């Protein structure tokens, strides 16, 4: 399984490119890696989305995306913001996840 340090490095690099704050959370809502404050990201937000049938969802300023490995749900990615950059960053991540 991929380590938290690798995930942190990856989202730090993505933030440098996209200027979008990102967070990765496990299925219990615990932060694995983040470039943002967790102030308004609740455990209920993460666990509720993880349990839903949706692969991606926008809730307020949070764009949520399920991260799967060989079909198994492992993490939830959260991108924060309302700009087109956030939508494009999440869309790119979503497309890359389905391409592998």
Residue locations for each model-derived region?
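Short linear motifs in exposed loops
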Residues: 35, 77-78
